[in-house]
From Swiss-Prot:
Listed EC numbers: 1.1.1.85
Highest taxon above the source species: Eukaryota
Biological processes annotated in GO: L-leucine biosynthetic process
Organism of provenance: Aspergillus niger
Protein's name in the database: 3-isopropylmalate dehydrogenase A
Cofactor: Mg(2+); Mn(2+)
Organism taxonomic ancestry: Eukaryota, Fungi, Dikarya, Ascomycota, Pezizomycotina
Encoding gene (name): leu2A
Assembly with partners or alone: Homodimer.
Length: 363
C-alpha cells in the first residue's frame, strides 16, 4: 500500500480555513481507498512562522517539505508583516527554490457550467474556456541583475539559458493526456527580445524532437493578451511561457472564471510522466485576505481543487482527481456556494458538502 507524506503549510489569515476543507477531502480519499495511506504533517510558513520563531521558514519545516511527496499550502502574507526586514514571502520563495519547483501550472476553466454567469466576460465569449498555463519559475527578469545607474535611471536584465527553456518545455506533454492531444501554445516577444528569440527557437526544437505528434503554435504575448479577452477559447490547450509573461498572463486569465476562490495551482519539481517521484506545492492562487479571514465566508474550492491536482501530478491517481472535480461540480451546481459566487453557504458547509459528495462518488 503506497503511503504518501504530505506537508501542510496552512499559512496566514484565511489559509488555515481553506486548508481545513481540503484536508476533509484528503481524509475521504484515505477512508474510501484501501490502497492509499496519507500521512499529513503540519508546519508553519510565512507570517505564522515569523510570529512563532522569528523566521518565515524554519530548517525543520524546509527539510520536511523537501522530503515530502507533496506540499499543501493555504495562503501566506498580510499587512501585519509587509514592511518588516523579515517577510512571509521570503519563506515561500525559499521553499520553492530549495524544492526546485521550476514550473508553475495554472488551469483556467469553469469548475461548474453555471459559473459562466459570474464571469466578467459575456457567456458567449467565455463558455467552454479550458486551458492550462505552464509558467517557467526560476529564470528571466525576476532573477536577473539589477543596477541603479543614476538617481533617475535603473536597469533590470532578463537572462535566459537554453537549459532553462529545455527544462520547462517538456511539460507540454500534458497535452498528451487528452484524446485527441491538445494544441500547445508558446508565448513570447520574439519580434523584439533576444531572450524570446532563444525561447522560440528552443521550444520549436524540443517540441519537434520530443513531441512531434503535438501541434505547436507561437503567439506574441501582447497578441495573446488580446485574444484572452476577445476569444479566450482560441487558446484552449496548453500554454507554455516565460516567468514574466506567465506572471502577467496567468493573472489576466484568473479573472475569467469569476472568482479567485475557484482556481488552484501546482508548482512542480519535475515532469509528471509517471516515471518518478514529482514533489510539488499545491495551493489556491488567491492571497490570505486578512479582511475576511475568520468570518467563515471564504471560498474553499480552489484549495480543494489543489488536492485534485496533487492526486494527478504527484501521486498519479487520476480517478481520485476526476472524482474530486466531479464532487465540486455537483455541489456547485446544486447551489451550495459561498457568497463570492452567488451563494449563502459558509466555508465549512461547502467543504462538508464536497466531502460528502466525494464519498458517494468513490463508493
Amino acid at each position: 500500500m503506497p503511503a504518501y507524506n504530505i506537508v501542510v503549510f496552512a499559512g496566514d489569515h484565511w489559509g488555515p480555513e481553506v486548508t481545513a476543507e481540503a484536508i476533509k477531502v484528503l481524509r475521504v480519499i484515505e477512508k474510501s481507498r484501501d490502497d492509499i495511506t496519507l500521512n499529513l504533517q503540519d508546519h508553519l510558513l510565512g507570517g505564522a512562522s515569523i510570529d512563532a520563531t522569528a523566521n518565515p521558514l524554519t530548517d525543520e519545516a524546509l527539510a520536511a517539505a523537501k522530503n515530502a511527496d507533496a506540499v499543501l499550502l493555504g495562503a501566506i502574507g498580510g499587512p501585519k508583516w509587509g514592511t518588516g526586514a523579515v517577510r512571509p514571502e521570503q519563506g515561500l520563495l525559499n521553499v520553492r527554490k530549495e524544492m526546485g519547483t521550476f514550473g508553475n501550472l495554472r488551469p483556467c476553466n469553469f469548475a461548474a457550467p453555471s459559473l459562466v454567469e459570474h464571469s466578467p466576460l459575456k457567456a458567449s465569449v467565455c463558455e467552454g474556456v479550458d486551458f492550462n498555463i505552464i509558467r517557467e519559475l526560476t529564470g528571466g527578469i525576476y532573477f536577473g541583475d539589477r543596477k541603479k545607474m543614476t538617481a533617475a535611471a535603473t536597469m533590470d536584465t532578463e537572462p535566459y539559458s537554453r537549459a532553462e527553456i529545455e527544462r520547462i518545455t517538456p511539460r507540454a506533454h500534458l497535452a498528451l493526456q487528452h484524446n485527441p492531444p491538445l494544441p500547445v501554445w508558446s508565448l513570447d516577444k520574439a519580434n523584439v527580445l533576444a531572450t524570446s528569440r532563444l525561447w522560440r527557437k528552443t521550444v520549436t526544437e524540443i517540441m519537434a524532437k520530443e513531441f512531434p505528434q503535438l501541434k505547436i503554435e507561437h503567439q506574441l504575448i501582447d497578441s495573446a493578451a488580446m485574444i484572452m479577452v476577445k476569444n479566450p477559447r482560441q487558446l484552449n490547450g496548453i500554454i507554455v511561457t516565460s516567468n514574466l509573461f506567465g506572471d502577467i498572463i496567468s493573472d489576466e486569465a484568473s479573472v475569467i472564471p469569476g472568482s479567485l476562490g475557484l482556481l488552484p495551482s501546482a508548482s512542480l519539481s519535475g515532469i509528471p510522466d509517471g516515471k518518478g517521484r514529482v514533489n510539488g506545492i499545491y495551493e489556491p492562487i488567491h492571497g490570505s485576505a486578512p479582511d475576511i479571514a475568520g468570518k467563515g465566508i471564504v471560498n474553499p474550492v480552489a484549495a480543494i481543487l489543489s488536492v485534485a491536482m496533487m492526486m494527478q501530478y504527484s501521486f498519479g491517481r487520476f480517478d481520485e482527481a476526476r472524482a474530486i472535480e466531479a464532487a465540486v461540480r455537483n455541489v456547485l451546481e446544486s447551489g451550495v456556494r459561498t457568497g463570492d459566487i452567488g451563494g449563502k453557504a459558509t466555508t465549512s458547509e461547502v467543504g462538508d458538502a464536497v466531502a460528502a459528495e466525494l464519498e458517494k462518488l468513490l463508493k
